Each structure stands twice: as C-alpha cells, then as structure tokens.
Amino acid sequence: MGKAENYELYSVELGSGPGGDMTAKMSKKKAGGGGGKKKEKLENMKKEMEINDHQLSVSELEQKYQTSATKGLKASLAAELLLRDGPNALRPPRGTPEYVKFARQLAGGLQCLMWVAAAICLIAFAIQASEGDLTTDDNLYLAVALIAVVVVTGCFGYYQEFKSTNIIASFKNLVPQQATVIRDGDKFQINADQLVVGDLVEMKGGDRVPADIRILSAQGCKVDNSSLTGESEPQTRSPECTHESPLETRNIAFFSTMCLEGTAQGLVVSTGDRTIIGRIASLASGVENEKTPIAIEIEHFVDIIAGLAILFGATFFVVAMCIGYTFLRAMVFFMAIVVAYVPEGLLATVTVCLSLTAKRLASKNCVVKNLEAVETLGSTSVICSDKTGTLTQNRMTVSHLWFDNHIHTADTTEDQSGQTFDQSSETWRALCRVLTLCNRAAFKSGQDAVPVPKRIVIGDASETALLKFSELTLGNAMGYRDRFPKVCEIPFNSINKFQLSIHTLEDPRDSRHLLVMKGAPERVLERCSSILIKGQELPLDEQWREAFQTAYLSLGGLGERVLGFCQLYLNEKDYPPGYAFDVEAMNFPSSGLCFAGLVSMIDPPRATVPDAVLKCRTAGIRVIMVTGDHPITAKAIAASVGIISEGSETVEDIAARLRMPVDQVNRKDARACVINGMQLKDMDPSELVEALRTHPEMVFARTSPQQKLVIVESCQRLGAIVAVTGDGVNDSPALKKADIGVAMGIAGSDAAKNAADMILLDDNFASIVTGVEQGRLIFDNLKKSIAYTLTKNIPELTPYLIYITVSVPLPLGCITILFIELCTDIFPSVSLAYEKAESDIMHLRPRNPKRDRLVNEPLAAYSYFQIGAIQSFAGFADYFTAMAQEGWFPLLCVGLRPQWEDHHLQDLQDSYGQEWTFGQRLYQQYTCYTVFFISIEMCQIADVLIRKTRRLSVFQQGFFRNKILVIAIVFQVCIGCFLCYCPGMPNIFNFMPIRFQWWLVPMPFGLLIFVYDEIRKLGVRCCPGSWWDQELYY
C-alpha cells in the first residue's frame, strides 16, 4: 500500500551502545500537520517514559507497589489492580468495523460508476413510465442487475479480506501464555495477561518476558532484545542499576523480549500498553494509509470512462434535441448511452483476477491482507529487507574450524558425508570436547525423533550452533557431557569475554580435572602459553601467534563470529577429587592454558535467496539490506546472496586496494556502500538521498528500526515503489510508510502483522520475489482483460447512436447488453487471469506508475476505434442481413423508427409490401437483438484469442496452453445457444431463435480481427521503438 506523508510521530529510537547495552533516543518526526489531541497524547507518552523504578532500592519498590520482594503481592490487591489497569496485553489497534469494510467494497471507483449507471436506469424507467411510453421493463431489470453485480462482487471482496484477517488472527503469539508468579508467598502459574504491577515473577531460559520487569536477582540471565533493536546479540540482565536511563540499564527486562538463558526474579513495573514496547506499538497509528497504485489506476480508468460516457451522452443529447426529439426523450437517450458505455462486467473481472492471484500467493506462503496489494508488489522497484530470518535462516550454524594450522569447512548435515577433516585427529577430539563441555545450551526434552538442525535448544544462538554441531559429530552431546560432570563454572560476561568450566574426567582411574574455556579469540589466546598441534602441546611462539592471527582475520573477514577454545588438565596433587573450586577466589589457574583451535559461526543465507536476489536484479528491482547486525557480517551476507555483486567495491575496499586514506577516494567510484547506524544518524536527508542515488548496491548495518523509516522515506523521494520487510514492534511505522509492508509470519510480532499489507508464512525472502512476479503478471493480465472488456463497448454503443441519428429500429436492447457484460463475456475475461507470461516478465524493469498506466491511450484507441469498430461493422452487417431477409431492406430502415415503434400502427408495410402488426415488429426487433448479440459474441471469441498476447504471436504463445480460456470459450458458445434456442426465452429475456446463416455472417469479421492483430504484433516485434510500436503496443 502507498502511505500518506501527513503525520506527526513521536518515536523511541533504540540501538546498541558500548558493551552491548541498549541506548535510547527520543525524537519527534513531523511530515505535514498533526492534530492537537495527537500532539498532547504524544507529549503524555513522553512523560510516561520518565520512570525511575530502576533507580529505586528494593524497599522503595516494595513501598511504591505495596508488595514484598520475597512473598509478592497479596491476592486481594492483585485482583483490585487487575480491575483498575486491565489485562496485561497489548491492545490491538482499533479495528475497522465489519460494516465499514463491507461498505468500502461497495464504494470503490468502479462501484460508484455502476451505482450512477443503476440510478440512471431507474430515472430512465421512471421517465418512460411517466410518459406512458413503457413498452418493456428493460431499464428496471438493468438497474436491478447492476445493483446485484456491485453487491455480489462486494461480498466476494469482503469474504477474501475476511478470510485473510482470520489467517492473520491465528498468529496471536506475542504474549506468553503462562507466567510463574509468587503471591502471598505461594508460587504458581497464571495466564500472563493476569499479571499486575507489583507482581513478583520468575523467568528462565526459553521464556518470554511477561511484562516490564525490574530485576531483583539473576543467575546468568541473558535476553534477546532484537524486537527492539534489530540486533540478535544477547543482552545481560542483572540486579544492578547501570544507567540512569531505564532503556539503557541492565536491571529492567522488557515485555515480549525472550529470556535466552539463566534465571531471574523481579517485580512487574509496567503491564500491557504501559510497557515500553506497548508505547512504541501505539506510535505506528500516526502513519496514515493512502491509495494503492492499482486503486489509482482504476480511479484513472473510471475518470476516462465516465468522461467519455458523459461526452458521448451529452453530444447525442444535443443531436437528439437538434433533430426534433423532446427533452425527456433526449434525456432517455443520454442515459441509455451512458449505461451502454459503462463496462458492467469489469468490476467482477478485476475482483476475481486479484482474488485468484491472492489465492495463488497464499499457496506459496504469502497471505495478502488487501487484494489491491497484489498488484502493488508487481510495481515494486526497491525492496528494503531484513537480514536475520528473511535473507538468512535465523539459525546460527558452525561454518569453519581452525586447528592443526588448517581452516576446515564444517559439515552440518545429518549424514556428515561432507566432512573435510580427520575426525580421529587428537586435536579435533580435544577441540570437540572443549566446545561440548564449555556450553550451557541444552536440547528441550522429547525431541529424539526430530532432525538435529530443527531441534529446539534452550540457550543463546552461538551455544545452540555449537551444541548442534557437537550432536552431529559426536552423536549424543548431552550424554557426552554427563560423562564429564561439571564441578565449577564462570559464565560468560562482557568484562572477561570468556566462559570457563571445570569437569571431572570420564575415566574413573584418572582423578585429574579438566579446565575448558571459550570466548573472544584474542582474550583466550592471551591466557595460553601453548598450542595443540596434531595432538602435541607446542610452545605458543611468535610463529604460531602469526598463524592464529592470519586464521582469525580470514574467518572474521567472512563476516563470521569467531570463538577461541583452550583447555588445561589440572594435576590431581594440587586439585584432588572433591577439591572446593571457588569462582570468587579463583583458586584455580586461568592462564598458562593450551590453545585448541578456532570455531566460526554464521547465520547462513537461505538456499533460495541468491537466485531470488538475482531475479530481482534482472527485473530491475533494487534490494537493500537493512539490519541491526555488525557491518562486516552484513557486508559478507550481502555479498554471499548477491546484494553486493561480485567485483563491486565499497569506498573502504578501494582505499585498501589503492593503499590510500578513505577520505581521498572519490565516493562515486564505489558501486557498493555500507552505512552503519551511527553514520546514518549524522546524515541529513539530502545526503542519504544522494547516497542512495550514487551507490546502486546498499547495505545499512547497526540500524535501529526507526532508522528504517528514514531509509524508506528517502527511497520514496527518489520516486521508488518500496516494499519493506519487518518483524519487530518497532518496525511497524516503516511497514505502514512503505508502499507495501511485508511482515514475517513466524518471527513477526502482532504489531508488525497489523501494519503490514502482506505476511510471509515462511519468513522467506524468495516468497517476496514470487509475489513480485505474480504482481507483474496480474498487471499484464488485467490489461488484457480490460482491453477485451472495453472492445465490446463500441458495438454496444453504436446501435444507440445509429438508432438516434439515423432512426433505424433499435438493433440491440439493454437486457441483451447485460447478458453480454455479465453472462457470456465474464468468463473469458476472467480466464485471461490464468494466462502465462508472454516472456520472462522478471527480465523487464518495474513499471513507472506515472507513465505505464493500466489503461493508456494505445489500449483505448486500439480497443475502441479498431477492434471495436470491426465488431460494430460485424453487428450491423448481421442486423441488416436479418432485417433484409425478413423484408426490410437497409434503405427502408433509415428513418423508420417512429412508425416502427408506434404501437397503434398495425399495418406497416415492408420492402415487399407485406403488412406488419406492432406485435410482429416487436418479435422481429427481438430477433435483431439476438442477431446483434450473437455477432458480438462471435467476434469476442476472436478478441479473447488475440488478447492472449500483446507482443508475441498467438501461435508462439500456444492456443491451448490456457485450458481455462478454452473452457470459457466453449461455455460462451453454449450460453449463446441456450439463450437463442431454449423455450421460453422470448417471453423472459427477449431472445429469439435465429437462422443458422446468421451465425456465419460475423465469422469473416472475426477472422479479420485475428489477422489484423497478428499484423499489429508482427510490426511491434520487428520495429521496436518505432511509431508503430509506440502507437499500437498497449
């Protein structure tokens, strides 16, 4: 969807500061006006942010919330607070009432035009009735039919939206189902939405934080704040107040973030919408929606149709007045012409075509909330994509290992058939032992039958990767750990940057202890004095330090997270069995260790992403990565998936290659650019726009979700149609601002899904590209359907024009037109939605919404004045043939209308002198209606065949590839036969049986249409860019 620029937004910008702490910045963005109430509300939000719970002592907290840090709240007080504050849940944005949704389906551009047409029919019926000139009820039937079409297609569109809403509602998983709470000294579990401020709660690894919580005690607690910052690095939570800002201190855990490991106990200080994330979620409501590109196209088309209808109607109203008709009669002509010009079947065609594409997308894991968003995807020229989980698998995986002075590629498949190193190596065994034992991650129980890569693990991303790799290589990592009981442990922290544990050995005859350590490679190496090479401990001299440094830089340059591992056997004399190891006193060595090797990990790209990015590139779509991750990692992933193409260099790459300072490099020489959040923060909007214009390949790293909004706005300033992916609550403003917001179905928050136009059920970037392809295809096919639908407007209109100007008996009635529009032609026009692409549409550039219109001048001119004109000649040839064979030669028909319609005249003579009563003349008139109807249908068969392609020959596309179209043509012919020859039709719908030869008259005209269009296409293919191409290619 396109989004309006008129909003005022108070934002909380979150990022990552030194030491992994969260930083916050409050700012107000303004684009256009904002109401006083909204401004006041935002100011109130700002005041509410000024909390001091993190700075209060435990006793002050107890007093403030009338609670106990050991026994929790009293149950009676908790019940009162629940009544006062309401449930602990994010209040969903105020939904649109169902009746409003349905009313919208009835009040679009085409719908309004059809309502007007129905009103005109009713007025015409009333005028005829008042004059006593009511020989048929055609206008009344037509009005009822038009209203029925609007209502039925409205119901269809509403049902599609309702069905998508139900799918989206099934994702309600942001709030945890259960929380462990202590009240009146008793510990029990309750639904998380029943928590109130002052509740004493407990969390453990694997739980979602159930509210904003002030930490009172913690043991190795780490949380994932990625829904706030976009960064997946775990954040430590502890009881100490480390910063005056509540958003930066470590003693506050935020609602809906994930507790990765460890345990914690704390007091609830905010619930529901009063939590930090609740306030951020409500800010997205400041961004308003506006029309989608397809809605603009349909409005443009309706303007053209309405303008032409009124022009033709007014012209012939004047002509009718000039040649002597009464005002009321001329007004009836005006209304009839307007109604004849309205393509009544087009609304159903557009709705069904979009619905079919939405259904097709749903089968490919894309749920479309708004039917019009289907086409918007096809117009997309820029995709701003997350990295984690969208471009990558959101599963940290061991990638490389360095031991015995060699870098090895890790095999993470179940069968281990691709392993490139000797698993019997003593060094490998030592490294594997260290990475298995020095690891706090654990598999959830009951997953023995689940493949290792898909098992759920309690622990942070890095330890999960190591545990799964150990499970794949050792076979039973948890059992292996049990053979080396842990007796002491120092958890990882950001100061030491290492994790250490001490274990007893599995051999009961060996009473030594094994000390193992992992952490930042440089920190681990500085604690080592030897290195393990081919099973032997060698002194860690300068040569081995250089080898380590080379390997470390090589792996780090790949954008991978690198960890170092070392070990030390503690002799039994100094550390006998039962020795009391003390982590506070550190009564064991932490230096003089033996370095075992390096292991690097990365969140690998999804297998389908490189091809998807390549498709985007060939389709002229720019893919921009926007991530909270480190610039090196972001750049490496961008290069591996093709966002940064092979051979492209950044300014830093050029400077390194030329060995010159970065500021001396001409930035325009760099095709690629990596901008981090700090740089983005210092750039003004014009600088960002210039960077986007200068560098075709862009990566934004260490960005906050709020900065994503700035990036989207800058792309839109360049005239791009922007699609944005997001999963966090703080992504919702960018999702709403984008022309089409794409939320993640698995990892996405409810706020993101509410703000988005489309949801990826598999969180896969390749699904977006599928959506783009389907969007482009439906635009092409809608163009074909509209061209097919518009063509018959001319043969439906010209009978009225000839009727008024030449005064022949009316060749075609309103009810007959209705059957063409809503019965026989609706199926062929819808069948074009199933047409395959003429060529690889993903090799074309995105359409320019200002230049490449759904209905352009060549389409209108070709449909109306060329193919439509041929159909009109066919209709009149058949009409005059039928009249002549019954005794009414063409010259006699001219000026015959007044006598023909005089129901008092019962002896009107034909060209042979035969006398006709009014009833006989009416029977012949209905026969002419049927003949003209059949003529249009025969020509429309040729028309639907030529509409299969706009450039290629139909022979190249294939006549029978689209089986739905073949069935539709057969159905069209069967309907025509049924209407002509079914008993009772003359009395019900004014259709008459006709002679066989009258079916044959329009066939040469149908052949002419086919040959004429093949010549047009040949010229378009042979002379690209010529006058012929510009004027005749639609």
Swiss-Prot record:
Keywords: ATP-binding, Cell membrane, Hydrogen ion transport, Ion transport, Magnesium, Membrane, Metal-binding, Nucleotide-binding, Phosphoprotein, Potassium, Potassium transport, Translocase, Transmembrane, Transmembrane helix, Transport
Disordered: annotated segments: 14-41
Protein's UniProt keywords contain Ribosomal protein: no
Lumenal domain ranges by topology: 119-141, 319-330, 803-812, 877-928, 982-996
GO molecular function terms listed in the Swiss-Prot or TrEMBL record: ATP binding; ATP hydrolysis activity; magnesium ion binding; P-type potassium:proton transporter activity; potassium ion binding
Residues annotated to bind Mg(2+): 386, 388, 727, 731
Phosphotyrosine: modified positions: 7, 10
Binding site for K(+): 339-340, 342, 344, 796, 821
Gene Ontology cellular component annotations, sorted alphabetically: apical plasma membrane; plasma membrane; potassium:proton exchanging ATPase complex
Subunit structure: The gastric H(+)/K(+) ATPase pump is composed of the catalytic alpha subunit ATP4A and the regulatory beta subunit ATP4B. Interacts (via the P-domain) with ATP4B (via N-terminus); this interaction stabilizes the lumenal-open E2 conformation state and prevents the reverse reaction of the transport cycle.
Name of the protein described by the UniProt record: Potassium-transporting ATPase alpha chain 1
Phylogenetic placement of the source organism: Eukaryota, Metazoa, Chordata, Craniata, Vertebrata
Gene encoding the protein: Atp4a
